[in-house]
Amino acid sequence: MSSRALTWPRTAKSSLLKQQTSSFVGQPKLGTPNCRSFSSTADRPINQSAEFSSSSKSYDRLGRRAKEKLLDREFFLSLLNSASTKREAKSYLARLKAQHPPKAQTEPTTGHSKGTVTQSLPSGVNLGSFYGASRSVYDSPVFRHDSTPLPPPSELPEERLHLALIKIRTPQLLDDTIINGVAKTLSQLSRLGMACCVVVDPGTAGNANTLRRVAAEQAERISIAVDAQPDSKSAHLDSVLSLSPMFPELPTVLSRKALLNPLRDGQIVVVAPIAYTEDVPKAVTISANDAILALTKELAGLAMRPDPDEDPWLTAQKIAKLQKEVSLDRVILLDPLGGIPSFRGPQTSHVFINMEQEFDDIKNELLHVQSSEACTATTPKGGNTFVEDPLERHLDNLQLSQNVLAMLPSASSGIITSPLEVSNSARTPQANPSDVSAVGTRRQRNPLIHNLLTDKPLLSSSLPMSRREAMNRRRGSINTPSSHTTFVKRGMPLTMIPNPRVEVWTAQNRPRLSLDDPSIDLPRLVQLIEDSFNRKLDVQDYLNRVNDRLAGLIIAGEYEGGAILTWELPPGVEDDGSPASEARMVPYLDKFAVLKRSQGAGGVADIVFNAMVRSCFPNGVCWRSRKDNPVNKWYFERSTGTWKLSDTNWTMFWTTPGLTENSQRFSDYEQVCRSIQPSWADDTGVVD
């Protein structure tokens, strides 16, 4: 089979082109040129569940082309629904097209048959001259110099393979409907250019022989479910892992080529956690987590054991070459328990985890709850030998995500969700035939496809719980908040000055801190502000205004985002250090900035905002923004209340509970937001 760079089996690109050229549907299918290879649905029967049409009988009566159009419609509806905006879906398709540019014609044009002039897709859609030159060009003589022959195909660099590594936990406890829904999502990911490698995890309860048998059976079951999807093919690899006598506890990939070849051919690879010993061939059941780590190490190009006598530069070159072959973009853990739960604050689950900042805290939180008597009382018990301690499994998922992402580039991410959530979002909502309006149930977003399109979680982690629940109701989610998908990034460190864990941020113990303190990189802070606001800052004027009022700073990563917070007094109130003066001080967000290149990606804004409202000012903070600021929608969703300041171009936001019930406090907030003067060097008359 040809390489992934040349094979487009019903991908989003071919489907998109087919929709654009629907006027050619009625024309006959002709031969395709040798430069492109398409797999046709006529090569094997189409197996499709009845959910794609109003009934299975009516679907069976459809012709092949009609079925393909129906499948394409289903695919694009799922695609558009999973993206937050149509722009995100369109942007991803553009990136997908850029990753797969049309290959140039390498065969001589002499002797072209007329049949090769007209190209068609596997569905029989005639593209005419959409992809090729006109007939007059083909009929014209072409003169070539053969002194510089093209390199053979084997020497051409292979296209980089984008890959998702997926672990399905205890699939033996899932019914066929859920398995089929997961298989459908995997097929859609493959069509979107994301190759999939699935590892079966039978759990840890039971003896080795039972686990090996269950793992093999479930791998075959998932493989059959994938093959049942239209234009989808699986490859069940049962001898991909090995154990060497020198490292009996560390499995390795036996053959990199045997693993990558089916993935490049567009097949979904299914692997059971079974390794074979190298000295005496014997099948050994290993931990699914060890299998995931071994595959990650191989796919990340880190499994090569260098020769100690080899030049380090040559070793580095070999590793770099391996890393250019594959990009392991996603590590997906499908566990019936869903995402990582949260036991602190109003949220019931972690929507986004910044590993650099939160891993230790979340791990300690889970360990604390696990050791408590309340956890023991709620641990499920029963006769099923495959049921395990739920908190132990959450800890296991958290630790595995951390170990895997530590080996991958910072752009890679992890997703922890339940097979049920993936399966439910993969289903097609059925409209009631008797309903005249023909309005169906709103689709539920697929967390895996949504993340592939946006590299973001389904819900922003900085949204208040009330907003999350409202958005879930709008989307028709049937799951409880506790089953939220958890989006995981290796992330970035977060610095809070002063550390609120050591010194609480209150008006009574204000730090004697200034922005030109040695612990603060002032030039980078200024560059962050100017890049985010796209304006020049009058640095000295700004320092004069805030240095005596600083409450603290929040810095994300290498000054990729940050917040400057101050204690402000309403006009007319003297700062004399008295309790009455301190009681009137207003916690104020003076600057909230994110580098342009980090805006909308990586969760930088969410990381900074969460630190502000959860760690630094948990009792509330206020800020202001221009009434016409496009960021206001983001502010509206995260604030407790807003107030448009009359006779100004400002809108005031706050997170302080019960602010409107305290008229004096509300007036102080308003007066502060009205009175602060901007410190921009380019005084253009714009208030912000």
UniProtKB/Swiss-Prot annotation:
It is an enzyme of class 2 (transferase). One of its GO terms (molecular function) is L-glutamate N-acetyltransferase activity. It holds the Pfam family NAT. InterPro entries: GlcNAc_Synth_fun, Vertebrate-like_GNAT_dom. Keywords: Acyltransferase, Amino-acid biosynthesis, Mitochondrion, Transferase, Transit peptide. It is found in: Mitochondrion. Residues 12-25, 34-57, 106-119 have a biased composition (Polar residues). Residues 1-45 form a transit peptide. GO terms for biological process: L-arginine biosynthetic process; ornithine biosynthetic process. Its main location: mitochondrion. This is Amino-acid acetyltransferase, mitochondrial. It comes from Aspergillus flavus (strain ATCC 200026 / FGSC A1120 / IAM 13836 / NRRL 3357 / JCM 12722 / SRRC 167). The gene is arg2.
